Every structure is written in structure tokens, then in C-alpha cells.
């Protein structure tokens, strides 16, 4: 059974639109936990467009489940993580011009730099996950980097047409299998909604789904605690069995 991590970045986006103090991600993290969230995820971007350093500091003190800090693989962010000591760090690609994270890390081309950062973080007792596309070469490079986890990018699945979605699902299923055979633990996220989450939650070996935008959108109608509860029910007991089909992309 997959667990549920709730991403609070969009709460901070609303706050930063007016540069004010509300809505407060720290307060809403508590409501998410009361709704059944198994963890809280925030992305501290280099441009600080939504989550701020102070948010992360306060969340570290108040989160009672798990705190997953998404961040770019930079010296500045590694130093912050070593100070804050979240329960997990997820290294993600970052571009200043993007609206949201657009794809997975290219671990293959960044292997040397990533190995050093991963060693620093895990040497301090902070498990590291790499946000990657479900491609064999990236998974193999992730394993060689020393990371203990990967988070599979589900954006292509979420954005696929009805006819293409089973093929994208098959890539995620096979990517999960490949990662586990390499000794990696597996999470997933990006673009998941109440309508498409169940096949991903049903994948054997999938440990946690990180979901934000769709939950915040529903929270506007039903409140955050209820929105999290509804998503938790889908993730905990998915009704749909996964489909099987296409092979891994970018075979090495």
C-alpha cells in the first residue's frame, strides 16, 4: 500500500502573490496531517518563488509525520539541508523560467557532482531520493550514485491522451520493477490527480506518492483536511489494477 505525501508549494504560491503572511504552510501542514497525510513535501527553490527558508525551518519543528525537502543539487541547498536535517531530500532539476518541474534529473550526465552531494547528505543521516524519468539508463545511474531512493516522474503519464496512458503506465510499472531490482526504493509524483492516481498507487513496490496541486484545488471547495482524506482513500486502497505493456524508454 502506497503512502501519501502532500506537497504544500501551492499554499506558499498564494501567500507570495501578495507577499503577506497567509495562507501559512506550517498551519496547513497540520491540517494535511490531520487529514491522513503520511508526509509533507516542500520545494525550496533557488529563486524562493514560493516556499521560503523560514517555512522549512518551522516545518522541521512542527511536522509530526515526515518532512521531504525537494531541492536543486547545489552547494547552497546542500548546506541548508545539512542544517535543517529533513527526513528525506529529493534532488530535482530546476530552471528559473519553468512554471513547475518539467522533467527528471539527468543523472547520467551529472553523476560525478551528484555522488559528492549524495555522500554528504547521507553521511549526515539524510536519505536521498533522485527525481528521475522511468528510463533504464537514469535508474542505473541513480543506483551508481549511491542514492537510496528514486521518485519516478509521472508527468508523461498524467499528460498522456487516453490511448497513450496505458503505455505510459507500463513504463512506470517497468521502471518501478527495474529500480527495485537495482536495490532502490521507489516513490512517484507529478501531475497526479483524483482521476488518474489509482493505477499508480496500485503498482507493486510503489512506496509513496507526492501530490500537491490537485489536492489544493479540491481544498478550495471542501477544505484541506477533507481533500487530503479523499486522496488518502484512493492511494491507500486503489480500485484499479495496473495495466502492462510497453518496455522501458531509452534502453541502455
UniProtKB/Swiss-Prot annotation:
Top-level taxon of the source organism: Bacteria
Site feature Transition state stabilizer, where: 151
GO cellular component: cytosol
Intracellular or extracellular location(s): Cytoplasm
Binding site for 3-amino-2-oxopropyl phosphate: 7, 18, 191, 212-213
An example Gene Ontology molecular-function term: pyridoxine 5'-phosphate synthase activity
Transmembrane segments: none
Xref: InterPro entries: Aldolase_TIM, PyrdxlP_synth_PdxJ, Pyridoxine-5'_phos_synth
Keyword Zinc: no
Gene3D superfamilies in UniProt: Aldolase class I
EC number(s) on file: 2.6.99.2
Record-listed 1-deoxy-D-xylulose 5-phosphate binding positions: 9-10, 45, 50, 100
Active site: 43 (proton acceptor), 70 (proton acceptor), 190 (proton donor)
Pathway: Cofactor biosynthesis; pyridoxine 5'-phosphate biosynthesis; pyridoxine 5'-phosphate from D-erythrose 4-phosphate: step 5/5
GO annotation (BP), single: pyridoxine biosynthetic process
Keywords: Cytoplasm, Pyridoxine biosynthesis, Transferase
Main subcellular location of this protein, as a coarse class: cytoplasm
Substrates-to-products reaction catalysed: 3-amino-2-oxopropyl phosphate + 1-deoxy-D-xylulose 5-phosphate = pyridoxine 5'-phosphate + phosphate + 2 H2O + H(+)
Name of the top EC class for this enzyme: transferase
Described purpose of this protein according to its UniProt entry: Catalyzes the complicated ring closure reaction between the two acyclic compounds 1-deoxy-D-xylulose-5-phosphate (DXP) and 3-amino-2-oxopropyl phosphate (1-amino-acetone-3-phosphate or AAP) to form pyridoxine 5'-phosphate (PNP) and inorganic phosphate.
Entry similarity comment: Belongs to the PNP synthase family.
Subunit composition and interactions: Homooctamer; tetramer of dimers.
PANTHER family with a match to the protein in the record: PYRIDOXINE 5'-PHOSPHATE SYNTHASE
Name of the protein in question: Pyridoxine 5'-phosphate synthase
Source species: Synechococcus sp. (strain RCC307)
Lineage per the UniProt record: Bacteria, Bacillati, Cyanobacteriota, Cyanophyceae, Synechococcales
Amino acid at each position: 500500500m502506497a503512502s501519501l505525501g502532500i506537497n504544500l508549494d501551492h499554499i506558499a504560491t498564494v501567500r507570495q502573490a501578495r507577499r503577506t503572511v497567509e495562507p501559512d504552510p506550517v498551519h496547513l501542514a497540520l491540517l494535511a496531517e490531520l487529514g491522513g497525510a503520511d508526509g509533507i513535501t516542500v520545494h525550496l527553490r533557488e529563486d524562493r518563488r514560493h516556499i521560503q527558508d523560514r517555512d522549512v525551518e518551522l516545518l522541521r519543528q512542527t511536522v509530526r509525520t515526515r518532512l521531504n525537502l525537494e531541492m536543486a543539487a547545489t552547494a547552497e541547498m546542500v548546506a541548508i539541508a545539512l542544517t535543517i536535517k529533513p527526513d528525506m531530500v529529493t534532488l530535482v532539476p530546476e530552471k528559473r523560467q519553468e512554471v513547475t518541474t518539467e522533467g527528471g534529473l539527468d543523472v547520467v550526465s551529472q553523476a560525478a557532482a551528484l555522488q559528492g552531494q549524495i555522500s554528504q547528505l547521507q553521511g549526515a543521516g539524510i536519505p536521498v531520493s533522485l527525481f528521475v524519468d522511468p528510463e533504464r539508463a537514469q535508474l542505473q545511474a541513480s543506483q551508481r550514485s549511491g542514492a537510496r531512493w528514486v521518485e519516478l516522474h509521472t508527468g508523461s503519464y498524467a499528460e498522456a491522451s487516453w490511448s497513450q496512458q496505458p503505455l505510459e503506465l507500463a513504463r512506470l510499472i517497468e521502471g518501478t520493477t527495474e529500480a527495485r531490482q537495482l536495490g532502490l526504493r521507489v516513490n512517484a509524483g507529478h501531475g497526479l490527480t483524483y482521476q488518474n492516481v489509482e493505477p499508480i498507487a496500485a503498482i507493486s513496490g510503489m512506496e509513496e506518492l507526492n501530490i500537491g496541486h490537485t489536492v489544493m484545488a479540491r481544498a478550495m471547495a471542501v477544505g484541506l483536511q477533507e481533500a487530503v482524506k479523499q486522496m488518502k482513500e484512493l492511494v491507500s486502497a486503489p480500485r484499479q489494477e495496473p495495466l502492462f505493456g510497453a518496455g522501458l524508454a531509452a534502453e541502455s
